[in-house]
């Protein structure tokens, strides 16, 4: 069963890298993925919220702090699982492949944590926030630097930690 799940994961990655591959989309997603490194876009959004919403500043700062907390937790899981980045014969990743481990995706984890935490503060924007997080997660296998299961696990970790952290403040 595990072998068939891994094979399905690999096949989906191959399909993303071959059948759906478009140069312009790759460039746009690579630029967008850069904003997700270390959760920087989510931290910046939460800090901007803290600047403009003084009444709820502490909650915004808590949201900003939740992103690196999620990154740290995600790193711990990577060290336990130790899954290597995808290497597909004849199908190169877009840009440089990070030297770090693959499972789970930190981009997905920090994006879903950020969307969850910020979404508690601006409920009308939740669909857009989760859409932005989903696009960030999608970018990773599309660019060839993660398996689809890496981003699913990262999204789950980010959502769960985001909800836990939101409940703690």
Indicate where each model-derived feature is located.
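Alpha-helical transmembrane spans of integral membrane proteins, capturing the lipid-embedded, hydrophobic core
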Residues: 43, 63, 67-71, 155, ...
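Interfacial segments of alpha-helical transmembrane regions
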Residues: 48-72
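Transmembrane helix-loop junctions in multipass membrane proteins, especially transporters and channels
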Residues: 54, 79-87, 145-149
């Amino acid at each position: 069963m595990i072998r068939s799940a891994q094979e399905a994961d690999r096949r989906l990655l191959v399909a993303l890298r071959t059948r759906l591959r478009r140069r312009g989309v790759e460039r746009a997603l690579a630029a967008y993925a850069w904003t997700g490194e270390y959760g920087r876009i989510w931290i910046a959004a939460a800090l901007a919220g803290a600047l403009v919403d003084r009444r709820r500043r502490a909650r915004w700062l808590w949201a900003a702090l939740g992103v690196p907390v999620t990154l740290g937790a995600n790193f711990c899981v990577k060290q336990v699982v130790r899954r290597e980045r995808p290497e597909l014969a004849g199908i190169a990743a877009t840009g440089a492949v990070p030297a770090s481990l693959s499972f789970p995706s930190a981009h997905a984890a920090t994006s879903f944590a950020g969307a969850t935490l910020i979404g508690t503060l601006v409920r009308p924007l939740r669909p857009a926030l989760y859409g932005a997080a989903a696009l960030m997660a999608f970018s990773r296998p599309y660019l060839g630097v993660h398996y689809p299961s890496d981003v699913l696990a990262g999204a789950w970790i980010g959502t769960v930690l985001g909800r836990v952290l939101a409940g703690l403040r």
